[in-house]
């Protein structure tokens, strides 16, 4: 039997906690036998003293085990259970293509996603732009969809990693969110509860990233890869660029539209293509569906070219109570904004920098995201035809097309877009979409 205050004291004094001590504390968070003050105190001691790798693995596993851990063995699936997690960005719609692409190549993707957080868009919010789409199927239905379709994208239920929910809520109000061991535990507890064979992490870098510097993004990626592999799940991470909006659009319905166009081949933004393919390649290799990069890319390109990936997306939408002809008739179903018109720069030049975070917040301000949990989302608003770094901007090439609910909202968004995009008289050096791959 342990005492919570003695565990806090031990960590406060700079000592490593045992697996048993960590499990006792996490189970107490779940069972409400540990107070909010005690959670806050432990979070702050971890913030200042960090955690060893064994402590990090124990924390993650204890949070994972605080609720249900999905088990797929009884379904006798003929492929690996794989997923990816992104630290979030703007125009980051990769999940909507990646899940169907990997499923079309023989993987099973039980993706448990989140809502928008701060300036970042949420996969669940995007999917809810599709009429009828059900993000909370019951457990049996979720398993059926995975078995029949190969991919489902759902919201986190209360049975998955419940200790994390309470731990995170306390961290959020005690300035202890940005601790690498605590971020790692929070992300992986939910992902590992999916019962995965393999995981790829997409850790964003740049002005729209969660972590403020490249070094911190790299440290987070290394921590997640180390802990997940320590927990027995084959995991790699990619550091990808978020110094500009990833897709050509940012919003909810507008990003779903771009995802369908990507899958059908109607339009593929080159940077979005690079990042999506790179993440899918990691999933196929880690899931042992391909032996190397070349084989993985060939398989993925084939399911895009032969329409199989688009077909899987359509089947997922239908299985989750969306329209059965969504891929063929997406424009009929997706909401459109009252006002859509282009915004132009006041001067000419090349785009040298972009405050991606500010662009994400502009979408939120238009109603495309939540400032508080009770807010309702306007799925129709957002940006399309986003200009990219290095683009030559003049009276012919707009910075973006803004989709707004009225003129006043459009004007406010136009001001934000102009302020967020910096022009220079010469083009900047091009930056890669994927900076590096982390395997340990």
From Swiss-Prot:
PROSITE patterns for the chain: THYMID_PHOSPHORYLASE
Keyword flag Ribosomal protein: no
Keywords from the named record: Glycosyltransferase, Transferase
Matching InterPro entries: Glycosyl_Trfase_fam3, Glycosyl_Trfase_fam3_N_dom, Glycosyl_Trfase_fam3_N_dom_sf, Nuc_phospho_transferase, PYNP-like_C_sf, PYNP_C, Pyrmidine_PPas_bac/euk, Pyrmidine_PPase_CS
Gene: deoA
Catalyzed chemical reaction(s): thymidine + phosphate = 2-deoxy-alpha-D-ribose 1-phosphate + thymine
Enzyme Commission code(s) on record: 2.4.2.4
Protein name, per record: Thymidine phosphorylase
PANTHER family: THYMIDINE PHOSPHORYLASE
GO BP, sorted A to Z: pyrimidine nucleobase metabolic process; thymidine metabolic process
């Amino acid at each position: 039997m342990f005492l919570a205050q003695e565990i806090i004291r031990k960590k406060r004094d700079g000592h490593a906690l045992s697996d048993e001590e960590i499990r006792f504390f996490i189970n107490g968070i779940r069972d409400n036998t540990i107070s909010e003050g005690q959670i806050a105190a432990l979070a702050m001691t971890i913030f200042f003293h960090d955690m060893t790798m064994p402590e990090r693995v124990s924390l993650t596993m204890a949070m994972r085990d605080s609720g249900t851990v999905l088990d797929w063995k009884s379904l006798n699936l003929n492929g690996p259970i794989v997923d990816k997690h992104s630290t979030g960005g703007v125009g980051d719609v990769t999940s909507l293509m990646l899940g169907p692409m990997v499923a079309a190549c023989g993987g099973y993707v039980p993706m448990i996603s989140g809502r928008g957080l701060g300036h970042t868009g949420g996969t669940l919010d995007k999917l809810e732009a599709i009429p009828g789409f059900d993000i909370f199927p019951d457990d049996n239905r979720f398993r059926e969809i995975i078995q029949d379709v190969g991919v489902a994208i759902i919201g986190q239920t209360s049975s998955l990693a419940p200790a994390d929910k309470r731990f995170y809520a306390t961290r959020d109000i005690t300035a202890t969110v940005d601790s690498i061991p605590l971020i790692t535990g929070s992300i992986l507890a939910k992902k590992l509860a999916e019962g995965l064979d393999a995981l790829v992490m997409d850790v964003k870098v740049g002005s729209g990233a969660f972590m403020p510097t490249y070094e911190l993004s790299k440290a987070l990626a290394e921590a997640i890869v180390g802990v997940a592999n320590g927990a027995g799940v084959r995991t790699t991470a990619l550091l990808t660029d978020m110094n500009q909006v990833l897709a050509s659009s940012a919003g909810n319905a507008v990003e779903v539209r771009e995802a369908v166009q990507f899958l059908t081949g109607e339009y593929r933004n080159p940077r979005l293509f690079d990042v999506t393919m790179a993440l899918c390649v990691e999933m196929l290799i880690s899931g042992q569906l391909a032996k190397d990069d070349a084989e993985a890319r060939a398989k993925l390109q084939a399911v895009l070219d032969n329409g199989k990936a688009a077909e899987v997306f359509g089947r997922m939408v239908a299985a989750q109570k969306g329209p059965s002809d969504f891929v063929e008739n997406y424009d009929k179903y997706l909401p459109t904004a009252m006002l859509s018109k282009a915004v132009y720069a006041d001067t000419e030049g090349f785009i040298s920098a972009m405050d991606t975070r500010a662009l994400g917040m502009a979408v939120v301000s238009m109603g495309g995201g939540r400032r508080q949990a009770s807010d309702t989302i306007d799925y129709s608003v957002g940006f399309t035809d986003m200009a990219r770094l290095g683009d030559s901007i003049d009276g012919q090439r707009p910075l973006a097309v803004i989709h707004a609910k009225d003129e006043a909202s459009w004007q406010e968004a136009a001001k934000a877009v102009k302020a967020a995009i910096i022009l220079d008289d010469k083009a900047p050096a091009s930056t890669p979409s994927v900076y590096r791959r982390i395997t340990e």
